[in-house]
Amino acid sequence: MAPLQTTYALTQGRFIVGMIPDMRTPGQDRSLNVEPAAGIGFGKSVGQGTAERQIKAIATGQATAFLGVTVLDTTQLQDSYPQYATARVRTKGPVVVTVSGAVTPGAAAYVVPATGAFSATASGNTLVGKFETAAADGGMAVLNLT
């Protein structure tokens, strides 16, 4: 039988997408139901779904207002919330997200309505908070939702 893992990192990664990064005063979270059949990953921007208390990921072709960010749930069997699951959605406070373009601490954070990506670029995007850590394009940063 071949080994499953043959190399090990010296340390664990700093962040996991969707994680709550620290123990400061709690943020504000809502429990909402996942609408899409494909489910919704952790650390994703979400908006209002078709029905009350439903959410869907903000993505190309969806004209939905930003509600919050899905929070990591280690009880899920995959790296996402499946359809009909109750998702924890952060509406205020810190959460780790993947960024589009480089970001710096203190920079205003925006969600891109066409893609749902988080960016420091203001043009045509929706202000959602501030970045608390730096990250390169495609990296993970702490976003403090306001």
List each language-model region with its residue ranges.
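Surface-exposed, low-hydrophobicity beta-strand/loop segments enriched in small/polar/acidic residues
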Residues: 1-146
